Amino acid sequence: MDSMVDDDGVRMLVNYKGTSRSAVKAGFYELKKRMPKFMSKERGPIKVTIIGMGFVAQQAAKALEEFSDIEFLEKEIPGVVVRMLPRTITNHYNLLEEIMKNTDLLIDASKRLDTTKYIVSNKLIGYLPQSAVILDISADPYNDKLNPVQVKAIEGIPTGNLEKYIFETDDISYEGIPKAVDTTNRRVVVSCSAWPGVDPKDCMKVYDKQIKGFLDVLLKKDLDCLDINSENAFERSLYRSTLKYYQGNKEDK
């Protein structure tokens, strides 16, 4: 699905809103359980830091507004302050240290070009408040069978799934993280490799509308006959998702 893109590289079969909303809902209400004075009028605003500024990050910010309004607006309790970090900030370790100290909810909504490099080191996790929650929307997996090793954007956190997406600091899942990864500093983590599946009915309504054009092509054409130069945008997108196209691009690079 990641490779099913239009001529401008924008995904055509995707539910950014559903992905981000499901994730933020889980992370926000996990923070509610743990943050001191969460429902107090006397505290300052809840500080949220989002890594990334793409579609997923933007929808995460909108979802934060939604759940903040639900919880706080009519009660006159301070809501959330959202900071979104582009690469011109995440590339500077000295800036991230201070940002982490002032973050209650850290959200990874990044899309890295190089998955062998961390954005937030495990040492930086140590600067987060003890009550902070890490929300992993991107949910990139570790893969120590590759050389160099594929890692997550935030070092030392587990990756969840639909069966389990909330991890305490002593969770057994940490034992499954590659030994070369530093897991010394830990906070509660909310992570899922299939966020749209948390609210499946709403997600399927979106996919139902998007997938019809692709199915129409597949019902009329054999996969081997897909044409990148077709006048049909759905056919061109399907071709870009084939192994043949991927391998051809890889060889060109």
Model-derived features with residue positions:
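Adenosine-phosphate binding glycine-rich loop
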Residues: 2-41, 139-253
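Short, acidic Gly/Pro/Ser/Thr-rich loop/turn segments
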Residues: 57-58, 114, 142, 197
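Rossmann-like adenosine-cofactor binding region
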Residues: 84-181
